[in-house]
Amino acid sequence: MKTLQELTRPNIWKLKPYSSARDEYKGAVASVFLDANENPYNLPHNRYPDPMQWELKTLLSKIKKVSPQHIFLGNGSDEAIDLVFRAFCEPEKDNVVAIDPTYGMYQVCADVNNVEYRKVLLDENFQFSAEKLLAATDERTKLIFLCSPNNPTGNDLLRSEIEKILREFEGLVILDEAYNDFSEAPSFLEELDKYPNLVVFQTFSKAWGCAAIRLGMAFASEAIIGILSKIKYPYNVNQLTQQQAIAMLHKYYEIERWIKTLKEERDYLEEEFAKLSCTVRMYPSDSNFFLAKVTDAVKIYNYLVGEGIIVRNRHSISLCCNCLRVTVGTRVENNTLLAALKKYQG
């Protein structure tokens, strides 16, 4: 791995971050706050939130078994995706490499930041070759993006290939584990000490059932987290989001129950979906959704819209001709989908 200074944009490396009076305060526990020009009325919403989210990070660290200093929290995982571009990639000079197909925001953030985005096509089983991915890199490649389980394909990427990338690539490896809670594969969080170039993304939006609060997580070395924290906006995670996340962490048992139920529903829905006359092929899933090849994705998607049912039409992306991505819902929702498709006359 190159040094972090070599990977970081020079202006970011030298940047002095914004600091509030409360960041700098080292005295006794404060009871009077006259530093931030806040309105003294309408407690508690009149006060700015903790800019570093220490209470939330401390609770999260106990569940994830990662030190709070190795955790970055953002306004959704998309903030963390954008920040790694802004921190490490020089516009019009550097490039990133990613598997294809995968989550679309990696390319959106590359385009917004004017960074070349290089795609390496997956094979027919939606797996990648580390050799091919590494062959697409050059001396200006700062980041490699991997998503496991991958979106939209739903499958885990081969661990041995991920490890090869981590060993041989000199830049940062961004591993998006948004759907790892639904997988039998262990998280790469346990490998953070082994691979200093590893950055793991996770989210409260999927298994945790908190998409509305927009809270994403990045886990990495303390030095990498320090760079991301340096360039984030001062109060990027609002107080209501922090409070809701803390409440969820106190009832982790319920999240585990949801995960178990959703995995059972996934198995049920996959089995029943495979029996439909419009289904051509089912792709194995390690997530809370699956990809299915159907007779005519556009027609079936439009038919379902007319029935008040929304699925994701993935027909136009690489390797997904006539494919629909279907999220696992409740038993009632799943049966409503199945009933509608049984009536479909294609």
Swiss-Prot record:
One of its GO terms (biological process) is L-histidine biosynthetic process. The modification N6-(pyridoxal phosphate)lysine is found at K206. It holds the Pfam family Aminotran_1_2. GO terms for molecular function: histidinol-phosphate transaminase activity; pyridoxal phosphate binding. PROSITE patterns: AA_TRANSFER_CLASS_2. It is an enzyme of class 2 (transferase). It catalyses: L-histidinol phosphate + 2-oxoglutarate = 3-(imidazol-4-yl)-2-oxopropyl phosphate + L-glutamate. Its cofactor is pyridoxal 5'-phosphate. InterPro entries: Aminotrans_II_pyridoxalP_BS, Aminotransferase_I/II_large, HisP_aminotrans, PyrdxlP-dep_Trfase, PyrdxlP-dep_Trfase_major, PyrdxlP-dep_Trfase_small. Transmembrane segments: none annotated. Keywords: Amino-acid biosynthesis, Aminotransferase, Histidine biosynthesis, Pyridoxal phosphate, Transferase. Its EC number is 2.6.1.9. Pathway: Amino-acid biosynthesis; L-histidine biosynthesis; L-histidine from 5-phospho-alpha-D-ribose 1-diphosphate: step 7/9. Homodimer. NCBIfam families: hisC. Belongs to the class-II pyridoxal-phosphate-dependent aminotransferase family. Histidinol-phosphate aminotransferase subfamily. This is Histidinol-phosphate aminotransferase.
